[in-house]
């Protein structure tokens, strides 16, 4: 409970015969629950260097959590549940959030950035992906699709391309900004998942490019900002629990390695 924890690991995978071991930021051989506090993890050694790993169930109830990892940022052998807090994940070679069981988000703010296809912002294979609250943004080569009959909060999945530093926004028919986000890296094939209590049954427009003034940013996700000057990329009507537009790629692929890449600013601690 409380406090500040900063973990940095740089070790490579060690292989001895049939055995291997990789440096993790935080690893639990059983269930892991985070209640509060500030937790920053950087794990950059290479394949297997996951940020926070649980060999059973992972639950996040609160806290300010930022994870920069070569492999999965959050990984659980069973289920992952996020009930609150501010959670940021940036992987340079795999998924942002990877659950080998179900994935449930009921509250908080979660921004998860995975690498290019087949890696995802959110990956829970073909298991239930339940969203009932919170502000949720995932970006990567693909994403697991929220399970419509388990969700009570609407989501949109948009597929296209994106360049590092480019803005993307979602506006309602009355001009209200629901989402303003700065894409953290270049994707030839980008899949973006967004869910928010503000996303209701109605008509929306997705814009790319443009500029942002004012507001505050949580690792590229803006609140209270003025976004204008973007080019219309798509329109959609959120008349179902999950809306898919563009050339989005479904997730659920087995994890794999990827090339190292540059991360966001502020990680040089």
Predicted features by range, described:
Residues 1-269:
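A composition-driven surface/loop motif
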């Amino acid at each position: 409970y409380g406090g500040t924890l900063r973990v940095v690991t740089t070790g490579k995978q060690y292989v001895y015969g049939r055995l291997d071991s990789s440096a993790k930021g935080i690893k639990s051989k059983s269930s892991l629950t985070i209640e509060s506090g500030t937790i920053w993890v950087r794990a950059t050694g290479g394949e297997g260097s996951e940020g926070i790993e649980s060999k059973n169930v992972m639950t996040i109830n609160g806290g300010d959590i930022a994870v920069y990892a070569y492999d999965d940022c959050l990984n659980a052998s069973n289920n992952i549940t996020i009930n609150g807090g501010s959670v940021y994940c940036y992987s340079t070679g795999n998924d942002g959030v990877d659950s080998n069981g179900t994935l449930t988000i009921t509250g908080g703010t979660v921004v998860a950035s995975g690498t290019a296809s087949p890696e995802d912002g959110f990956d829970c294979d073909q298991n239930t992906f339940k969203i009932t609250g919170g502000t949720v943004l995932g970006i990567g080569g693909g994403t697991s699709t929220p399970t419509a009959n388990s969700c009570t909060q609407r989501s949109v999945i948009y597929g296209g391309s994106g360049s590092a530093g480019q803005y993307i926004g979602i506006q309602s028919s009355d001009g209200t900004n629901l989402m303003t986000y700065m894409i953290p890296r270049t994707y030839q094939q980008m899949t973006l998942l967004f869910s928010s209590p503000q996303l209701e049954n109605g008509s929306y427009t997705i814009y790319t490019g443009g500029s942002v003034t004012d507001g505050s940013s949580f690792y590229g996700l803006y609140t209270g900002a003025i976004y204008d000057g973007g080019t219309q990329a798509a329109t959609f009507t959120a008349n179902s629990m999950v809306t898919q537009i563009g050339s989005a790629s479904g997730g659920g692929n087995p994890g794999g390695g990827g090339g190292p890449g540059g991360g966001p600013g502020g990680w040089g601690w």
